[in-house]
Amino acid sequence: MCIEDIKALPVGELAAKDCALFLWITFPCLCEALEVLTAWGFSYKTVAFVWVKQNRRNDDLFTGMGYWTRANAEICILATKGHPKRVDAGVRQVILSHIEEHSKKPDEARERIVRLMGDIPRVELFARQSPEGWDVWGNEVECTAHLPMEETPCCG
């Protein structure tokens, strides 16, 4: 799915009036991610999480590829629509955890999102698994959320 297709997803139309969006990105795609937020009608607020990756088999830091420096972290940015409420001011930004399957994000991030925002309805787009308490949409899961589109590239 190209960036224009992602920007065209009706996420902003389906989102609650007051809600938060957490978007995982790699550093080289930062500008495109901000374009997506804007296209969906959200305002960038901060970096919610910095995932410092550890190797699968030990606690050493993972060393990935990189354009300038060797990447070993990913970020999850936080954007809002309206005025969502934060329910826990003690949620920390840095997540230090081991990498798992390709592109799988740490479960701890979902747990922190629930702590931060409360036990409210939530959906994971481009999901790779179906975590309890979350609706999911993507081509690697059985979708429980549906995006009305002329042509649905992921769940069609």
Regions found by a protein language model. Name each.
Residues 1-156:
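Class I S-adenosyl-L-methionine-dependent methyltransferase catalytic core
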